[in-house]
Design a protein with these regions (language model features):
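Conserved small/polar residues in nucleotide/adenosyl-binding loops
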Residues: 223-225
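A cross-domain feature marking catalytic cores of carbohydrate-active enzymes
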Residues: 42, 184, 218-220
Length: 225
């Protein structure tokens, strides 16, 4: 009998490691007390009493808007011009960078990552991710009929720049372009944030590798944490 779903779909259950680690942290808190455990496992901001932070400046402003304004379509499927301008200003902050850029509104960070994979990689090409990663990266690649190749994220307590370079060079030689995910800062699920020196090494390498083909790195979704 024919299967209803695609033949090449990944039938493995999705396991999001961050929630496994969250459960371990919660178990440790229950056993040892919250004063003895720092839970830095998930991308949420909590106050000193352990309560989820919901900023009044955000929600009060949103709630003050007329419901018709909130329900109205944007002027373009890529987002209102003022929204796109503010997103770019938020990304570059006060660096005064004048980058060639285009901003597109997506349904959340997941939509941004998924859209990038679909628009950058052809079917059968490879997405590069860290060996410890958010489980949905692989799912997004599978949906796009793409493969996944992982670099070892850590060398001891530091970012494994050697493994990252080796993996990127291998993929570049095979397909002529690189789409790599570095989830930083506050990497999901480890919470690791790369140092300025580590980022300088990555940037220098990517500038060098870009002589062989396009190089794209993404996912700063937790930069606000």
């Amino acid at each position: 009998m024919k299967k209803f779903i695609r033949e090449n779909i990944d039938h493995q259950p999705i396991v999001d490691n961050v929630f496994k680690i969250v459960n371990l942290a919660n178990d440790a808190i229950a056993k040892k007390g919250k004063e003895n455990i720092v839970n830095a496992t998930i991308g949420s901001l909590y106050d000193e009493d352990g309560n989820l932070v919901a900023l009044d400046t955000v929600f009060n402003t949103y709630n003050s808007l007329d419901n018709r304004t909130k329900a109205k379509y944007a002027s373009s499927f890529s987002g209102n011009p003022n929204f796109r301008k503010q997103v770019y200003n938020w990304v570059v902050q006060d660096t005064k960078l004048d980058l060639c850029h285009s901003v597109i509104g997506t349904p959340g960070g997941s939509g941004a990552v998924s859209s990038t994979i679909l628009n950058v990689l052809d079917e059968g090409q490879t997405l590069i991710i860290p060996h410890i990663a958010w489980g949905n990266y692989k799912s997004m690649a599978t949906i796009a009929n793409c493969k996944v190749q992982a670099y070892q994220m850590f060398d001891g307590d530091a970012f494994n720049i050697t493994s990252f370079k080796e993996t990127c060079r291998e993929v570049m030689a095979r397909q002529g372009k690189v789409l790599a995910i570095i989830n930083d800062p506050c990497h999901n699920p480890t919470g690791y944030s790369m140092t300025v020196e580590e980022w300088n090494q990555v940037i220098d390498f990517c500038n060098e590798l870009s002589n062989e083909g396009p190089v794209i790195i993404l996912d700063l979704s937790l930069i606000h944490i």
